[in-house]
């Protein structure tokens, strides 16, 4: 686990003077949401709160969601995904580093025509994994839930990529790594961003 300091930015206040805020608050004021960690329930709650806040401020204005995610908890990701699909504001998604597993679902779930990757970013699709702890009846329940959730993820990705659930199942039996160009061809994104300038 890395430790780092969250940077502060200095912004000019409209009535004169300066205001110091953390970088995430500054980005939020610009309608930018950034996911830079694996997803757990705490991260999901923060993302959902930001999406709901931005939608309440301006329900028709786009939200830019930047993703650099190593994966995470499926139910937590589904809560964020469902919120993205529920709100009226279109969510433009951009992968800036990697979108692994649950991060890939969020990337693909962006507004149609508004899903992008930087040229050296990558997407990894793979099947969900179980924890495998507890008594046998609990393990059976976990396995059943895993099968159900895998089907849900395949249906979601099918809806956003145009690929069949059967093809997605076959393609995710093992880790499948996509470059930006390969993700575009597969239907996970709509564009590969070019360097500015």
Curated annotation (Swiss-Prot):
Keywords on record: Cytoplasm, Hydrolase, Protease, Serine protease
GO-annotated molecular function: ATP-dependent peptidase activity; ATPase binding; serine-type endopeptidase activity
Keyword Translocase: no
Active site: 126
Compartment(s) of residence: Cytoplasm
UniProt key word Hydrolase: yes
EC number(s) per entry: 3.4.21.92
Reactions the enzyme catalyzes: Hydrolysis of proteins to small peptides in the presence of ATP and magnesium. alpha-casein is the usual test substrate. In the absence of ATP, only oligopeptides shorter than five residues are hydrolyzed (such as succinyl-Leu-Tyr-|-NHMec, and Leu-Tyr-Leu-|-Tyr-Trp, in which cleavage of the -Tyr-|-Leu- and -Tyr-|-Trp bonds also occurs)
InterPro entries attached to this UniProt entry: ClpP (IPR001907), ClpP/crotonase-like_dom_sf (IPR029045), ClpP/TepA (IPR023562)
One term under GO cellular component: cytoplasm
Primary enzyme class: hydrolase
GO biological process terms on file: protein quality control for misfolded or incompletely synthesized proteins
Entry's family note: Belongs to the peptidase S14 family.
Function per UniProt: Cleaves peptides in various proteins in a process that requires ATP hydrolysis. Has a chymotrypsin-like activity. Plays a major role in the degradation of misfolded proteins.
HAMAP family, A to Z: ClpP
Protein name according to UniProt: ATP-dependent Clp protease proteolytic subunit 1
Lineage, uppermost ranks: Bacteria, Bacillati, Actinomycetota, Actinomycetes, Mycobacteriales
């Amino acid at each position: 686990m890395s430790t780092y300091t969250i940077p502060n930015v200095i912004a000019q206040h409209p009535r004169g003077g300066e205001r110091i805020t953390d970088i995430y608050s500054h980005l939020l004021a610009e309608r930018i949401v950034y996911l830079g960690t694996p997803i757990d329930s705490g991260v999901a709650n923060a993302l959902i709160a930001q999406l709901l806040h931005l939608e309440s401020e301006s329900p028709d204005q786009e939200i830019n969601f930047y993703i650099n995610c190593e994966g995470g908890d499926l139910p937590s990701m589904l809560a964020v995904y469902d919120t993205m699909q529920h709100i009226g504001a279109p969510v433009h998604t951009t992968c800036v580093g990697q979108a692994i597993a649950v991060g890939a679902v969020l990337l693909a779930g962006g507004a149609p025509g508004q899903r992008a990757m930087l040229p050296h970013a990558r997407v990894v699709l793979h099947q969900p994994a179980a924890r495998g702890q507890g008594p046998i009846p609990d393990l059976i329940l976990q396995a059943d839930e895993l099968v159900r959730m895998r089907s849900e993820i395949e249906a979601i990705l099918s809806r956003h990529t145009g690929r069949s659930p059967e093809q997605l199942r076959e393609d995710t039996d093992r880790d499948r790594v996509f470059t930006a160009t390969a993700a575009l061809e597969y239907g996970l994104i709509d564009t590969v961003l070019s360097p500015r300038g």
